[in-house]
Regions:
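Bacterial Sec-dependent N-terminal signal peptides
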Residues: 1-24
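Cyclophilin-like peptidyl-prolyl cis-trans isomerases
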Residues: 19-213
Length: 213
C-alpha cells in the first residue's frame, strides 16, 4: 500500500501558498527494474508493507519524497511533523549549489498574524545510518544534525532536513576522490565501494557525507 501526503512548503521565498491537508491512499505499483537500479531505490518495499510518500509543493515546483521503512524513527518523526502542519509555510533556508537544499528550521517558518502555533522541536532523533545500503546519491531526503564535536552520537535534528544534489563525477574524478579519501585516513567517514562509485558516476551526489549523516 502506498500513502501519499501533500504539504505546502516554500523555496527561496517567504510567502507560502495556502496549506493543504490532503492524504491519498493508492495501490502500490510494482515495476520491474534492472538489478542494479533495485539497489539504488531501496524504498521499494514488499507488497505487504506501506510505502509512505510525501509531496512537497513549493513555489519552484513539486518534490516527491519517499520514506524508508527501515529507518522507523526518522520516518515516523517526519510523518508526525507533516501531519501536524509544521512544514506548511516553511522555507528552504539553506541552498548551496552542487551540494543540497535544506529546510525545516523553526526560526524560518512563516507565522500567520494572529494565529498561535505550538510545536515541540526541542528533541533529537536517534541516528539510523544504514550504510552502504543508503548513501548520498542525488535526490536523497536526509535529516540534518549538529557536527561531531557537539553531537558525538550523530543524533538528527528534530525538524531540519535536506535533499542532496551534489556533483556529477566522471570515472577519473571518482577515482581521484577515492584516492584523496584514502590519504585523509581517519578524517574520512567511509570509502565508497566499487558499486557505490558507479552509482555516483551514474547519478551524482555527495559521497563525503556517507556513513556520517
Amino acid at each position: 500500500m502506498k500513502k501519499i501526503i501533500t504539504i505546502s512548503a516554500l523555496l527561496l521565498t517567504a510567502f507560502a501558498p495556502q496549506a493543504m491537508a490532503q492524504e491519498q491512499t493508492q495501490p502500490t505499483q510494482q515495476t520491474a527494474r534492472p538489478a542494479f537500479d533495485n539497489e539504488l531505490l531501496p524504498w521499494e518495499t514488499p507488497r505487504d508493507t506501506t510505502c509512505h510518500e510525501v509531496l512537497l509543493e513549493t513555489t519552484m515546483g513539486n518534490i516527491r519524497v519517499a520514506l524508508y521503512n527501515d529507518t522507523p524513527h526518522h520516518r515516523d518523526n517526519f510523518l508526525k511533523l507533516v501531519n501536524s502542519g509544521y512544514y506548511n509555510g516553511c522555507i528552504f533556508q539553506r541552498v548551496i549549489k552542487n551540494f543540497m537544499i535544506q529546510g525545516g528550521d523553526y526560526s524560518c517558518r512563516k507565522v500567520t498574524p494572529g494565529k498561535v502555533e505550538k510545536f515541540d522541536v526541542n528533541y533529537t532523533v536517534p541516528a539510523e545510518i544504514i550504510y552502504p545500503k543508503y548513501y548520498h546519491k542525488r535526490g536523497q531526503l536526509c535529516a540534518a544534525r549538529e557536527g561531531d564535536d557537539e553531537n558525538p552520537t550523530k543524533a538528527s535534528a528534530s525538524t531540519d532536513f535536506y535533499i542532496t544534489w551534489g556533483r556529477n563525477f566522471s570515472p577519473r574524478q571518482m577515482e581521484y576522490y577515492v584516492e584523496k579519501e584514502k590519504r585523509e585516513g581517519a578524517k574520512s567517514y567511509a570509502l565508497p565501494s566499487e558499486q557505490l562509485q558507479q552509482g555516483y558516476i551514474k547519478h551524482g551526489g555527495v559521497p563525503h557525507l556517507d556513513n556520517g549523516y
